Curated annotation (Swiss-Prot):
It comes from Saccharomyces cerevisiae (strain ATCC 204508 / S288c) (Baker's yeast). Residues 11-22 have a biased composition (Low complexity). One of its GO terms (biological process) is positive regulation of DNA-templated transcription. It is found in: Nucleus. GO terms for cellular component: nucleus. Residues 1-10 have a biased composition (Pro residues). One of its GO terms (molecular function) is DNA-binding transcription factor activity. Pfam families: Fungal_trans (PF04082), Zn_clus (PF00172). Residues 1-37, 140-177 are annotated as: Disordered. The gene is CHA4. Keywords: Activator, DNA-binding, Metal-binding, Nucleus, Phosphoprotein, Transcription, Transcription regulation, Zinc. This is Activatory protein CHA4.
Amino acid sequence: MMLEPSPPPLTTTVTPSLPSSLKKSVTDNDQNNNNVPRKRKLACQNCRRRRRKCNMEKPCSNCIKFRTECVFTQQDLRNKRYSTTYVEALQSQIRSLKEQLQILSSSSSTIASNALSSLKNNSDHGDAPNEKILKYGETAQSALPSSESNDENESDAFTKKMPSESPPPVGTNSIYPSNSLSIIKKKTDGSTRYQQQQVSLKNLSRSPLILRSLSLFFKWLYPGHYLFIHRETFLSAFFGDTNTKSYYCSEELVFAIAALGSLISYKSETELFQQSEVFYQRAKTIVLKKIFQLEDSSLAESSSSSKLAIIQTLLCLAFYDIGSGENPMAWYLSGLAFRIAHEIGLHLNPEAWSNVYEDELSIMDFEVRSRIYWGCYIADHLIAILFGRSTSLRLSNSTVPETDELPEIETGIEEYIYDPKVILSTANPLKKLIVLSRITEIFASKIFSPNETLLQRSEYLAKFNLEVYNWRRDLPPELQWTKRSLMEMTDFNPTIAYVWFHYYIVLISYNKPFIYEIKQSRELVEGYVDELYYLLKVWKNKFKTFEKATIYMIYSAILAIQCMKSNLIKKDRKQDFLNFLSAPTLNYELARKFIENSEDALHNSETMDLLGTLSHGNDFALEYNFDFTLLNEIDMLIGGNTNDGLSK
């Protein structure tokens, strides 16, 4: 395969080809001088290494004396000097090849194959067929020009042949780059807007209500399903740390987090509790004006980095809506967040990010972006399970590596940590949740496909339950739990328990539709309901009230009650879950709406469904109940009778 580079579709780097005048082979000179006897000018390798005088015979006297192999160098390259232009050309070629290999290594096999084919085709049909091209496996020495080719005329010719500027890249199958769909326009001076943002953040950092709200959020709700936020970089940017990129915090993100934090405050803190909806509306107004450029066109001129806070804001607002029972709005906002994440290439390998973000990225920046993306991935899969819908972010098109533990701020943020004495680990639970989400992603279409028989679906469900059982068994010691450990537990740790609630929501959601037909599903759900009861009991014994409860806890209780309503699951715990959802200290509207909806359902069969227009929550069969009529017609138009022949 020829490796003389012409610009492949994946790179913008163009390497000028070397002119044939500078690629004159050394072997041609050797052939022309075969008939001219010449005396060896270099001593053998042993004499040169030992600095002995060589008699130039083969073998020489020294090699005979010391019984070593006598090897002479065939070429004397001491006087060969290559022009600076030629050396720079070779260096340019090497850089180009390295860039291509890096891009290919982070691309799919199809893209890599196409790129390599392009390289081969461009080499086979080059514009200089008589040139000596450096081939794969050939030494660089054999392709270097002889000293006679380094004259001034050839250097001039080479300089003239080099393009003055790189031509535009071919790009991907789209006319737009992978990092953004924006058409680049001349940017205006953003210094004034930046200064205004910093003044606004400075004022917010002095607000007692904002500070109290942020403290409640990070102490009680973080990390949970908010893994797309990295606490340390957010707080550093919020408090004006010059060593942290300012775009990790924005006005709308502060208000969105404050809305979630103030929502779990005590109702006796009247001013703070009432600000929750105000903060929510403020964040929503700012972010939607930016996205849809309503009175604010800054997003069109902003960098991809500044959109990170927009993604985080949208997801915070989505979870606020989920807690309020406003599921359609939550679906819209989260969908926007995942679209923007793809638009800026957040799902790509860091090797590709160097062409996405305008500013200089440090290793810490790479790690934070990885954390944000995988947090989005978990949020997407959780929302999909809650609503019984398919996911937007999939592992198959996510090339960004898994996140690792990030450094914490040693002092100064004690008010924003649940237990300042304990080091919070988020990377390990996140990695485990990624694996669990991947398992659900694989089995969803198989378990809930109406094209499979009940026997086939039950077999897939059994395999799914086994995979998730193995997942739970293989958890690290700090995350492991059992029914017995829950019964004996006295200390509830929300920074760990969210992993357990996520597990229960996944398992109950996947087994709930089959409790009528499959005995194993009934037994599993019954066991999970018992474990949930003990987990909620530990919470109540420690904290007494439920102001600081999470969406995880509410949805787990709702799923448990729905299963017990089937009359196939023991109802011993039903009243306990109902008492939890109707507790006056529980601040989420979702719980109140569920209780009211359940009571109205006893008297009115036409009552409004809890989930609004997303009325079939947790009904994956709706999502995978495909009508293949149109698809079959299209297949017939495309393939005619070919498919019939293949199927036979």
